A protein has these predicted regions:
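Amphipathic helical "hinge" segments at domain boundaries
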Residues: 1-67, 145-148
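Redox-cofactor binding/interface segments in oxidoreductases and associated redox assembly factors
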Residues: 13, 70, 192
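Flexible glycine-/small-residue-rich
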Residues: 15, 72, 94
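Residues that cap or initiate secondary-structure elements
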Residues: 17-19, 47, 74, 243, ...
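Bacterial carbohydrate/catabolite-sensing allosteric modules
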Residues: 29-40, 55, 61, 77, ...
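Short, flexible loop segments at the rims of nucleotide/cofactor-binding pockets, characterized by
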Residues: 45-48, 67-70, 106-108, 167-169
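Short beta->alpha connector loops
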Residues: 47-50, 71-76, 196
């Protein structure tokens, strides 16, 4: 039917939440490549609920889409099974996975956390802590792997870790700093898995008159908007979300034009050195 052939120019993108870090940038990168080629992206939010993602994909897969795009997050076995057996390209983007459904483009979280921790160590800090908060279990494992690798390489204790069962936001960062100082008064640097956590920790430092970076260095992850405006400006790891979107768009386009998918090297993340470390 005319509708069926028309909808095969539609690519479905399911994300947990549009306000997710870097999501709109990745979407813009995809649009930049796919729109001029005649494809429309239909965007749907699963609100971090696996059963909602299942419902959305069940509907979308029944409507003759050209391809499916997901963020590199946990998917249910049902979704993985459907997508592996669907005769369309599937792109997971954002971070590299050990077990992608099909195509996968993103940063290497292990390498990024290793590089960030290594930089803190090279600056002379030794009593370093790692603050994590609610995030995908496999991303937490990857961050932990990079952290352990850097700390153990320099024979430093990797045990100052708090994984808070709270969202990775400002208030969690502010609430967890006292916990670190209570457990490890010798703490001289804090690595945070998001800029929001790091900025929350900075607010708490100001409240307690802890000088950053003289008394305590703080670094974040993501190079979000807030990292440039907090006081002092935050040293962080930049994730090139738009580039990830562009590369994912190009790879999808090639595949849709009957090209092959060759495993893609991770997209490099880069250190942003500012005043907090």
């Amino acid at each position: 039917s005319a509708l069926a052939s028309a909808s095969s120019w539609t690519i479905a993108m399911v994300v947990p939440n549009l306000s997710e870090a870097g999501c709109s940038e990745m979407f813009a990168g995809l649009q930049q490549v796919l729109q001029p080629a005649g494809y429309q992206i239909m965007l749907a939010e699963s609100q971090h609920r696996l059963e909602q993602e299942e419902k959305l994909l069940e509907t979308l897969l029944a409507s003759n889409i050209a391809a499916a795009i997901l963020l590199s997050v946990e998917h249910s076995d049902t979704v993985r099974h459907w997508l592996k057996n669907a005769s369309i390209p599937v792109m997971e983007m954002g971070a590299m996975r050990a077990d992608p459904i099909d195509m996968n483009i993103g940063i290497d979280n292990v390498a990024a956390m290793y590089e960030l921790t290594e930089m803190v160590i090279q600056r002379g800090y030794q009593n370093i802590g790692l603050l994590c908060a609610n995030q995908e279990q496999w991303i937490f494992q990857q961050h932990l792997q990079g952290w352990y690798k850097a700390m153990l390489r320099h024979h430093l204790s990797p045990n100052r870790v708090i994984n808070a069962a709270m969202p990775p936001n400002f208030s969690t960062g502010a609430a967890q700093l006292p916990e670190f100082l209570l457990a490890w008064p010798e703490l001289d640097a804090l690595v945070c898995v998001s800029d929001e956590l790091a900025c929350g920790a900075l607010y708490e430092c100001q409240r307690r008159r802890i000088k950053v970076p003289d008394d305590l260095a703080v670094v974040g992850f993501g190079d979000s908007d807030v990292s440039r405006v907090c006081q002092p400006p935050l040293t962080t790891m930049a994730v090139p979300h738009r580039k990830i979107g562009i590369e994912a768009g190009k790879a999808l386009l090639e595949r849709l034009n009957d090209g092959d998918w060759r495993d893609h090297k991770p997209i490099a993340s880069s250190l942003c050195l500012r005043e907090s470390c």
